[in-house]
Amino acid sequence: MWVLQALAIMLSIQAGVLDLVEVPPVVRSLPVALPAPVNLPAVLPGSPGLNDPAKNRMLPPKRPGAPSRGGKCAPAARYFLSSDKLQAYLLSILPPQIEDMVKCDKVNMEGVLGDILATMQDSNLLSILDITSLLQGGGGLGLGGLLGKEGNEDPSKPSSGSKATGGLGQLLPEGLPGKEGLGGLLNLGGGKGSGKGLLNGDGLSNVVKPLDDIVENVDSLKAAVQDKVKSVVPENIKDPFSDLLNMDIQETMLKLKVKQVKVGSTDINMGADGIKVLSEVTADVEGEGLLGPVFTLLQFQSVMDVTMNIAVSSNNTQCVNLDVQDTHMHVKEMNIQLLQTVTETVPLPTSLPLNDIIPIVLTAKMNENLEKSDSCGIVLSDFNDCKNTTGLFGYQVHTARISPKGLSIDYCVKANIDNKTVPVPGGRLPPDPKNANVSITTASSALRTLVKYVAKQSSVQMNDLEAQITYIAFAPQENNMLRLLYKVDITKDSQPYATGETKLFISHASKILNSKLVPDVKLTRSEHSVVPPETKEEVEGIMAEVTRKAWSRFNELYKKMSIPDGVSSNTLTNSDVKLLRSNDLQAAS
């Protein structure tokens, strides 16, 4: 019957007939099941759009930018840094920076948490503490021991006098005076005298003295425990335990401060799209002003993940750096730890019923504060000092890329000879040495550019003879030797007269010390031949002068030879420069 009446009411509303200011008696009599009120704040600070499910998850990282590319030249040099060395650098530099970021004033983790707790001003301690786990924790030394509720005891039954003394009773060694009065002091059993022992003062004076003796004689029991225990039993409070459990949160949390941040583990994944970092972090936020019988400290411990993407950037210069992108803090849980000091400090993690809300608000607000801050972010400025260097060869970044093997930087190369800039042709570079941490490779075209320039500058005139190098080539030999071959056209009175051929054998023992090339080349021997042979005696002098001039010029320029800067935090400190079969130069460590 009432269903039909309700239907009639709905139709009347649609027709605009019924005035809803006065509720009809039929509706007033309908049974309604109301849920029990929940003592939670309606609006949490700094959490706009909290009900948006998309904001309750970790923010997806932005896609890293494409590898940095320079001009259209073909690379003629490469610097390589292995993934092991790169990860070692990140593992040494990231954890302290992550800790500083979480503790940063502008991220304001403690302030955000304080604002959340401040909204619970109508709540008491029981509304946020999972009191069941407290009553079961600590082996009778927590609130369960003090209230006579052991972990396996039915909380609906009256507590027994013997178990009621278990908590503080374990604090008093056998034989100390006053221990026998503890049962009277904490007579919280279900009998008629429940609670009277605490208020009539019997045994109270006998407990304070033993507590003083414990603090003095047992190193593991801190003085703060005694002070907190005393504060529970002031004479003017009739029910101190009730007052403790119903203490207003704002009275207990006078101040919040991030005391310690610790990075537990850091995983680094290197791929073609950059470096992905995941760090597990715990942050302890301490509160001052808590009154408790056996606990000296109330800690809020946040467990979070810090993620970031790291890409390479060069801005088309000779320097490459690491750019930290998409730093994100994801608070997974917020625990309360009650640190108990008896023989040692024992953390008792206590879950928050609000664990589904507090981490979400902290995550959103802390990331918002981090994004607004200009001083809390992670900057890897010491990865590369990016100094402008000069030398015989100039290097400009062509491509910088990250791969599972490590960081590779390819360079365009130009030779700066006699105030002239000569592009160095690029080509296919040899692979990086196996198991190398750091390596530098310079294409054979760099040495060829140098040799060709020397050949053009080695013309000689002597009496009526003139010699000019018309062909030059070089090839590697055993034991890091270099054979340089060149041909000379010799004219007499401007007419072709003879053709000479010279082979120079050069030892190569150059090194890279502290990222600088230390040249060491020596001319060990030379061989000459002339066509026609009958002109040999006449042209020997001019051919020797060509050799002297060419070698002098080559040696002078080679000593000015420079190498790519690479990364200043990972350089070659003492490495031999090897001449490969491909005529490329390579050094590694």
Curated annotation (Swiss-Prot):
The keyword Transcription does not apply. It is found in: Secreted. Abundant in the lateral nasal glands. Also present in the posterior septal and vomeronasal glands. Residues 1-29 form the signal peptide. It comes from the Eukaryota. One of its GO terms (cellular component) is extracellular region. Glycans are attached at N419, N437. Residues 49-71, 146-170 are annotated as: Disordered. The keyword Signal applies. This is Vomeromodulin. It comes from Rattus norvegicus (Rat). The gene is Bpifb9.
